[in-house]
Amino acid sequence: MAAIYLDSSAIVKLAVREPESDALRRYLRTRHPRVSSALARAEVMRALLDKGESARKAGRRALAHLDLLRVDKRVLDLAGGLLPFELRTLDAIHLATAQRLGVDLGRLCTYDDRMRDAAKTLGMAVIAPS
């Protein structure tokens, strides 16, 4: 089955109640595997720093239910060449990680507009359940 790649904006919605959280949970309920970059471990926890211990605990649980893919030299080299120029470095690493999945990538789940636009430019199927 094709993987669902979650970027950090989606993972945070699994840890903290936001308007899209329930729709995202429903969407993911029967979809496996769920993957992200190992980068998400730091990115998500930093996003939850000011949300309290229960949010951080929920963030750790959400991350534990994902297959976190290594950020290796090939991912970094690929990320370094991704366009558009305005693409932020961490987003480029997420996109490069997703791109490395090749045919095993089903959809990329993001709630970040710049990430969505860049992923579509790369030919990825993008979702944001709401």
UniProtKB/Swiss-Prot annotation:
Q: What is its EC number?
A: 3.1.-.-
PINc domain mapped to chain residues = 4-118
Single GO cellular component term: plasma membrane
Q: Which GO terms describe its molecular function?
A: magnesium ion binding; RNA nuclease activity
Q: Which GO terms describe its biological process?
A: negative regulation of growth
Names of the cofactor(s):
Mg(2+)
Q: Which residues take part in binding Mg(2+)?
A: D7, D91
> Which keywords does this chain's UniProt record carry?
Hydrolase, Magnesium, Metal-binding, Nuclease, Toxin-antitoxin system
**Disulfide bonds, paired cysteine numbers:** none
| EC primary class | hydrolase
| Entry superkingdom | Bacteria
What functional role does this protein have? Toxic component of a type II toxin-antitoxin (TA) system. An RNase. Upon expression in M.smegmatis inhibits colony formation. Its toxic effect is neutralized by coexpression with cognate antitoxin VapB46.
Q: Which HAMAP family match?
A: VapC_Nob1
Q: Which family does it belong to?
A: Belongs to the PINc/VapC protein family.
State the protein's name: Ribonuclease VapC46
